[in-house]
Amino acid sequence: MSGDIHTTAGKIEDLRARLEAAVHAGSERAVEKQHSKGKMTARERINALVDEGSFTEFDELARHRSVSFGMEKDRPYGDGVVIGYGTIDGRQVALFSQDFTVMGGSLGEVFGEKIVKVMDFALKAGIPLIGINDSGGARIQEGVVSLGPYGEIFRRNARSSGVIPQISLILGPCAG
């Protein structure tokens, strides 16, 4: 960022830079590796699924809070999962897409909180939820706090059962 963070223009420039970093959270090498396996990235999958220009993302600037095992040095925006809503053939849906290019798509505390948030949104809005799974499982570096979100996710799966459609796409490794 080259602008003055103490000015409105500088703050806007800083926000734009952060949002751009969130879009490219996975390293170039990780993206190339994903593509070499014939797989799309999380955002590419969303863009291929929803109507063009309809996706609204939330919490793209969320980052993990862990300081164990040197994790404070690697805090990518989005924390490895993209969440939001869009339309498919004009029908509104909520969705999450796990990003294998960011920490192997591993589920940590913030990652799980984001999935829970979009699940709650889908249930409240009464719209289908689509989960695109491509994950290395629990983010073990975060210890037991990475396991708690699984229970919250499963609780919401049960609460949503028979109320809203829940669709899971397994497009890579998946735990659970």
Report each predicted region and the residues it spans.
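Terminal-region recognition feature
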Residues: 1-167, 173-175
